[in-house]
């Protein structure tokens, strides 16, 4: 039962989606002329069938198709005036040029997993359009060079599947949830079960094609190293629209091993979590053991780049308290492990190409980083939070290994050496009227954890977007650096200033903007 509950949470985290239509409100009067002029401009370069106005019969289904958090499926949500579905980079260029010319800002959606929905909605009324990358999802693999080009609209599952089809000897270090869009994931860093071996997805990006705020299509050489640095972990949308990415593929062995061991409180879960927080970051980088803590216990979930025999020897030597043995092992290919970890034994390689889900839930998320071990006595207090009304789950990923050998300034993603593990607080509920308890639980446990996590700043992961951390203030039609610094240093630490200076060079008028976009520092 505990294992099935853990799989259920994993599926919710990875695949919450919706297909229902929502009520549409009429655009405000000031938007009328903007809409007409913008549409006229777009239709010069983009086929009309790829444009959706609010008056279009298909608008609601297109907009909601990848809304992963259904609390935003509401007539109160501020939606785009237009949705543009490009099929090539020239369509993206046209959208930006027309948007600049006619005062229409652009937001960008790849997979729709932005936890706060900022890729397809606005917190406040304003005229904007969404460039929905869903139709740009090509994956091209060069097995000999061990590289791939992947469009931003592809899902991680598309990329993983394409890699394995080209070569069983290659893999890529990105997220566990296979329905996540490449564009947003890479833009925020992106990590999964190969984090300790190969770092983040962004660490392994070697080129990109970006449409900048002037509508130019730039590769790495043309954009320059500061711009290229910024798109690899500086958060989506701030520095242009990435049409496609070139990534370095990494070797994986013929067989990998996974295990999932659940321990209840009465089976010593608290002792094991206390031990895990120092053992897991110090293990060889071929082994990643993460934890999903919920209710009365914890699930220890692992990927090992090697055989069951070798893994049992390693666990017996380094973490014997867990009691892991050969009966817990499942050997498989790397690509088979990709669906197995989030979906369990029923997950298949073909599932990686699935872009839909019938699961519908509301959600709230927060994140933390732990730099010092938490005493057992405090873990006992933490676990009491997991049985409170409205409680969710704590997902904990260990660092160390390869990720710790990279300088903090190598990319905007700054979590490298000195981090034991990160925490994602996740809570789901069903039905609009049920929001109060789970939402408050998330904020309350976050407050409770203050003494145990990073400080000055209290760090967070930008791909676990959280508007509780702060939002931009706009003065003179430009986001202010002071307001952005409040939340920005939590995501990026000392890299935030360089991001803001880069923004000031390439988009000083702050065209690409949302509630947590990088402000220009001039």
From Swiss-Prot:
Enzyme class: oxidoreductase
Positions glycosylated per UniProt: 88, 325, 354, 477
Cross-link (6-(S-cysteinyl)-8alpha-(pros-histidyl)-FAD (His-Cys)): 113-177
Entry keyword annotation includes Amino-acid biosynthesis: no
Entry annotated with the keyword Flavoprotein: yes
Family of this protein: Belongs to the oxygen-dependent FAD-linked oxidoreductase family.
Designated name of the protein: Berberine bridge enzyme-like Cyn d 4
Organism encoding this protein: Cynodon dactylon (Bermuda grass)
Taxonomic lineage from the root: Eukaryota, Viridiplantae, Streptophyta, Embryophyta, Tracheophyta
């Amino acid at each position: 039962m505990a294992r099935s509950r853990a799989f259920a949470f994993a599926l919710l985290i990875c695949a919450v989606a919706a297909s229902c239509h929502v009520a549409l409100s009429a655009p405000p009067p000031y938007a009328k002329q903007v809409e007409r002029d913008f549409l006229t401009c777009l239709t010069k370069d983009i086929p009309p069938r790829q444009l959706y106005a609010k008056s279009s019969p298909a608008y609601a289904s297109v907009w909601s198709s990848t809304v992963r958090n259904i609390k935003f499926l509401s007539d109160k949500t501020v939606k785009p005036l237009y949705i543009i579905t490009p099929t090539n980079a020239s369509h993206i260029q046209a959208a930006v040029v027309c948007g600049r010319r006619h005062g229409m800002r652009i937001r960008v959606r790849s997979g729709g997993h932005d936890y706060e929905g900022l890729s397809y909605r606005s917190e406040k009324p304003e005229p904007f359009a969404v460039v929905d990358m869903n139709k740009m999802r090509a994956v091209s693999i060069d097995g000999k060079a061990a590289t791939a080009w992947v469009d931003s609209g592809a899902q991680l599952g598309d990329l993983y599947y394409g890699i394995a089809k080209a070569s069983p000897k290659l893999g890529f270090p990105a997220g566990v949830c296979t329905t996540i869009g490449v564009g947003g994931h890479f833009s925020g860093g992106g990590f999964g079960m190969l984090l300790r071996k190969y770092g983040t997805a962004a660490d392994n990006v070697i080129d990109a094609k970006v449409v900048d705020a002037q509508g130019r299509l730039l590769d790495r050489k043309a954009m320059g190293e500061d711009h290229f640095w910024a798109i690899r972990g500086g958060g989506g949308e701030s520095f242009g629209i990435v049409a496609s990415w070139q990534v370095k593929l990494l070797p994986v062995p013929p067989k990998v091993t996974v295990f999932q061991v659940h321990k209840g409180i009465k089976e010593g879960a608290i002792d094991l979590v206390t031990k895990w927080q120092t053992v897991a970051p110090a293990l060889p980088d071929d082994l990643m053991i993460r934890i999903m803590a919920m209710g009365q216990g914890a699930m220890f979930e692992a990927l090992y780049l090697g055989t069951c025999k070798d893994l049992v020897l390693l666990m017996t030597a380094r973490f014997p308290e867990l009691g892991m043995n050969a009966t817990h092992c499942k050997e498989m290919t790397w690509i088979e492990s990709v669906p197995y970890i989030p979906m369990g034994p029923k997950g298949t390689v073909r599932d990686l190409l699935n872009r839909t889900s019938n699961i519908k839930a509301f959600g709230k998320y927060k994140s933390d980083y732990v730099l010092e071990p938490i005493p057992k006595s405090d873990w006992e207090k933490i676990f009491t939070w997991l049985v409170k009304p409205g409680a969710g789950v704590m997902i904990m990923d260990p660092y160390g290994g390869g990720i710790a050998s990279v300088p903090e300034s190598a990319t905007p993603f700054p979590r490298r050496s000195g981090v034991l593990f990160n925490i994602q607080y996740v809570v789901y509920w069903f039905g609009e009227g049920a929001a109060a308890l789970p939402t408050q639980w998330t904020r309350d446990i976050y407050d409770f954890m203050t003494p145990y996590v990073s400080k000055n700043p209290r760090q967070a992961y930008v791909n676990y977007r959280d508007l509780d951390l702060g939002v931009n203030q706009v003065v003179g039609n430009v986001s202010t650096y002071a307001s952005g610094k409040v939340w920005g240093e939590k995501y990026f630490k000392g890299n935030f200033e360089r991001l803001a200076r880069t923004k000031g060079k390439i988009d000083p008028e702050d065209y690409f903007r949302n509630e947590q976009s990088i402000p220009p520092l001039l």
